[in-house]
Every structure is written in C-alpha cells, then in structure tokens.
Swiss-Prot record:
<dbReference type="GO" id="GO:0030163">
    <property type="term" value="P:protein catabolic process"/>
</dbReference>
<dbReference type="InterPro" id="IPR042203">
    <property type="entry name" value="Leu/Phe-tRNA_Trfase_C"/>
</dbReference>
<dbReference type="Pfam" id="PF03588">
    <property type="entry name" value="Leu_Phe_trans"/>
</dbReference>
<comment type="function">
    <text>Functions in the N-end rule pathway of protein degradation where it conjugates Leu, Phe and, less efficiently, Met from aminoacyl-tRNAs to the N-termini of proteins containing an N-terminal arginine or lysine.</text>
</comment>
<keyword id="KW-0012">Acyltransferase</keyword>
<protein>
    <recommendedName>
        <fullName>Leucyl/phenylalanyl-tRNA--protein transferase</fullName>
        <ecNumber>2.3.2.6</ecNumber>
    </recommendedName>
</protein>
<keyword id="KW-0963">Cytoplasm</keyword>
<dbReference type="InterPro" id="IPR016181">
    <property type="entry name" value="Acyl_CoA_acyltransferase"/>
</dbReference>
<dbReference type="GO" id="GO:0005737">
    <property type="term" value="C:cytoplasm"/>
</dbReference>
<keyword id="KW-0808">Transferase</keyword>
<dbReference type="InterPro" id="IPR004616">
    <property type="entry name" value="Leu/Phe-tRNA_Trfase"/>
</dbReference>
<comment type="similarity">
    <text>Belongs to the L/F-transferase family.</text>
</comment>
<dbReference type="GO" id="GO:0008914">
    <property type="term" value="F:leucyl-tRNA--protein transferase activity"/>
</dbReference>
C-alpha cells in the first residue's frame, strides 16, 4: 500500500473529490482514530465493466429475487453497517471523519449506495463515490448470504446502463477476482482515471428514483 502525506483532519468534501480525481483515497488507522491518511496503491484494483461476470449459481439466486434492491434510500444506514465489526472483519477504518465526509458527498450527489432489504430490514449493501464517468467502490457489508454479492451485480448493471466507464475497487481480493477484478499498474490506471473523470458527471439514479 502506498501512502501519501501525513495524517490530516482538515479534509473537505471538495478536497476529497479532487483527491479521487488524481488517484488518491483516504483511510484511517482505525474507527477510533479521527485522523486520515491518503492512499495511492502501486497496483490498483478495478473491475472492467465489459468483462464483469459471476457464477451460474449466483445468477440462479438473483432470478429468485431474495431481496428488494434499492438505490440511495438508506445511505447513512449502509455506512453504519459497513462500519460495524463482523466475524470476518473485527475492526474497520470507517471513523467519524469518514462518515461526515461521505455523508456530505452523498448530499452533493457524489456518493451513492446500493441496498438489499429483506422486508424492512437492511441486510446488505455497498457504497461508493461517483465522479465523471468513474465509480469508486468504498465498502460493502452482508448480513444474509449473497446480499452484498447481489448488490454488486446490481451496481454493475446500473453503471453499464448509465454510461460509466471505470469501476475502481481500490484493491483486489480473492472474492472480487471471482467477479473479474484485476490489478492495473499505477501509470495505466492514471490514464484510465483521467479519461473517466474528465467526462461529464454521469447520473447514478434514474429519473424516477430522484426525490422531487
């Protein structure tokens, strides 16, 4: 992991968007640490939108529609759930500074969530940042089997339909590789990023999903 600069508590939403546009993103040492540091990986994780794929078994589950999938209806709740400890993630980097910054980006129309509901219960979701024609995935959670996977599938379908050209996952994991995630070198990523963020901001929501 490549770090840039020292810890900082003076980051504003506008500075955060500028950082994304040049390949940086913030993290914290822990949820209890109010400070952030910038990260610029030497190898950047992306999911090429034209080669995203998933298993036949997951496709079968998706056809059964086990969850009600929504967009941008419970952003704060998704953020809270992503910040909660889980058996496979005893601690997280989502501190109060992160919460405040990404809530501000959501209010500006630059952060979004995909949510899986089981009845009235939020059981899975993910959130990320949109800028130009790029979407930067930040975190996801799952409280039911396959919930976050299904949210990812719906995210990619939405990004494709709306005209996004870059899905940045920051890092690759074995889990994300099953969906087609790859590592790209910093120089190659910079070219892809510049192309994506210099395009006009692509709307994430459909017209009927926008509150009057």
């Amino acid at each position: 992991m490549g770090r840039r600069s020292s810890k900082d508590r003076s980051i504003t939403p506008d500075i955060l968007l500028r950082a994304y546009s040049i390949g940086l993103f913030p993290m914290a040492e822990s949820s209890d640490d109010p400070e952030l540091f910038w990260v610029e990986p030497d190898l950047r994780g992306i999911i090429p939108l034209d080669s995203f794929h998933y298993s036949k078994s997951l496709a079968k589950i998706i056809r059964q529609k086990p969850f009600d999938i929504r967009f941008d209806t419970a952003f704060a709740a998704v953020l809270d759930k992503c910040a909660e400890p889980a058996p496979d993630r005893p601690s997280t980097w989502i501190n109060q500074t992160i919460r405040d910054l990404y809530t501000a980006l959501f209010q500006m129309g630059h952060a979004h969530s995909v949510e899986a509901f089981e009845g009235d219960e939020l059981v899975g979701g993910l959130y990320g940042v949109s800028l130009g024609a790029a979407f930067f995935g930040e975190s996801m959670f799952s409280r039911r089997s396959n919930a976050s996977k299904i949210c990812l599938v719906h995210l990619v379908e939405r990004l494709r339909a709306q005209g996004f050209v870059l899905l940045d996952t920051q890092f690759t994991t074995e889990h994300l590789k099953t969906f087609g995630a790859i590592d790209v070198a910093k120089d190659e990523y910079s070219k892809m990023l510049e192309e994506a963020v210099t395009m006009a901001n692509v709307p994430f929501l459909l017209p009927e999903e926008i509150s009057p």
